[in-house]
From Swiss-Prot:
Belongs to the actin-binding proteins ADF family. Actin-depolymerizing protein. Severs actin filaments (F-actin) and binds to actin monomers. InterPro entries: ADF-H, ADF-H/Gelsolin-like_dom_sf, ADF/Cofilin. This is Actin-depolymerizing factor. The keyword Nucleotidyltransferase does not apply. Preferentially in mature anther. GO terms for molecular function: actin binding. It comes from Lilium longiflorum. One of its GO terms (cellular component) is actin cytoskeleton. Residues 5-139 form the ADF-H domain. Signal peptide: none annotated.
Length: 139
């Protein structure tokens, strides 16, 4: 179903792959992009379970917006193994204004399609989504 405010639809693959990340942990991360020609949010890249946070950040284009989810594993102060699913809205300062507006107007609707997101992060440059920030937001 298309989003009335931005006219964007969400490809079923987005929801299916997110469910696999959440339930089966088949992926470490998923990068999504808006395909303007077809007015739809689609899966751009799937990160394998052995890929790192650096692998994830390197696949975000420096001049284009993206949405992403990252499954972050960590150990608490009580020595418990935990995991949190981050939703990251990547909107670099150098991206086109139209693109930033499109991603901003579609974000909430798209996020609602992904049931199970625990932490949301918005970043306009890599420093705003450093590993230190991810760790701080996870706890």
């Amino acid at each position: 179903m298309a989003n009335s405010s931005s006219g964007m639809a969400v490809d079923d693959e987005c929801k299916l792959k997110f469910m696999e990340l959440k339930a089966k942990r088949n992926f470490r991360f998923i990068v999504f992009k808006i395909e303007e020609k077809v007015q739809q949010v689609t899966v751009e890249r799937l990160g394998q379970p052995n890929e790192s946070y650096d692998d994830f950040t390197e696949c975000l284009p420096p001049n284009e917006c993206r949405y992403a989810v990252f499954d972050f594993d960590f150990v608490t102060d009580e020595n418990c193994q935990k995991s949190k699913i981050f939703f990251i809205s990547w909107s670099p300062d150098t991206s086109r204004v139209r693109s930033k507006m499109l991603y901003a107007s579609t974000k909430d609707r798209f996020k609602r399609e992904l049931d199970g997101i625990q932490v949301e992060l918005q970043a306009t440059d890599p420093s705003e989504m450093s590993m230190d920030i991810i760790k701080a937001r996870a706890f």
